[in-house]
Amino acid sequence: MENSKRTIAIVCGGDSSEHDVSLRSGQGLYSFFDKERYNIYLVDVKGTDWHVAFDNGETAEIDKNDFSFVKDGKHVYFDYAYITLHGQPGENGVMQGYFDLIHLPYSTSGVLVEAMTFDKYVLNNYLRGFGVNVADSILLRRGEQYDEDEIAERIGMPCFVKPAADGSSFGVSKVKNADQLAPALRVAFMESNEVMIEGFLDGTEISQGIYKTAEKTVVLPATEVVTSNEFFDYDAKYNGQVQEITPARLSPETAEEVAKTTSRIYDILHANGIIRIDYIISKDKDGKDKVNMLEINTTPGMTVTSFIPQQVRAAGLDIKDVLSDIVENQF
């Protein structure tokens, strides 16, 4: 019966440069969910404009007091929110805080974990304390004085300049000498008030998804990222300038180490739902593979061609069942 189904909001959009990317993830999720089991609605959130987007192009305003809306003269209340906001306010803990206040279960980690993973500098330093390999980095705040030569000496060249709190590679630059730092910082500060300057790690970039429920742990096959661009930037990520190989071409030993690291980081963070962890596999001084954590995406892209759906298919799983696992784990 229709009334026995859980009613789920796919919360997408957001306030960042990734708004349109998030909408695409929302549409992907809408196509993936088991509609025999759930009533699914797309909720577009941008600033103070929160509305349900219906298939026929019509919309209905969300009542922010209880996250409900009116359809055909009747109030519709949600049982669960699947958050696929990339960037603010869904990847930095703000949306999670709102849902906590109104006691609505949701798909992601909680406020603290979201805020910490959204800030790359904070995350790096936190995980380093648990023995996770990360690149050296420096944090600069808007208006803070800096010395290009000192940074070059401390971090080395080349390096990456990136917004400390952002995603989808907006505002990220690869810097090859000290003279390129100032323009790269200007670009990064357009996206965030804090910028991280991070040492370059030479190696193979991979990305791995994971989710855990009360019953099971599912570590998905890793994806290897091969791009002709300088790095895996926005153009490579969303305009097809990349080759994605799933499963990644890793030795069995390295693949096992990556999977163990992924599972351990998930537990360290007390993460929830499905997350994706990016790594660089470099070589240590003895020529052995070294697993370096690059960043964590707690609301990974969910279009048909995104990493997570690719990895789910490679694992021989059905994305519909994966999403049901994540939802039902909250009940």
What name fits each language-model region?
Residues 2-12, 16, 24, 116-204:
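Active-site nucleotide/adenylate-binding loops and adjacent lid/helix of ATP-dependent enzymes
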Residues 2-6, 131, 252-331:
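ATP-dependent carboxylate activation and anion-phosphoryl transfer catalytic cores
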